[in-house]
Amino acid sequence: MANSITLTVGETTALKTFKDHIAYAGMPSENVYSIVQMKNVRAKDALAWNLFFPKSKTEIVIDKVNILVENVTTDVIRLRMGMWQ
């Protein structure tokens, strides 16, 4: 697993390729957090959508990338990312 990555609301980081990114979108309720998945961010045909997770869910997979959510608050999320298939 990689080092921790800390994102505030609106900040992005790359997933396994630089075409795919995620951004922290905050917490729409006290028990739910949201991550935006973005595809082809530099292209004209870029796509993005929100993913919603219960705050209790600490292990998630986005685009075949394992993500461990170490801490999540309304303003900040701390993650560790690793890849496997």
What do the PLM-derived regions correspond to, one by one?
Residues 1-85:
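Surface-exposed, beta-sheet-biased, low-hydrophobicity segments with strongly acidic/polar composition
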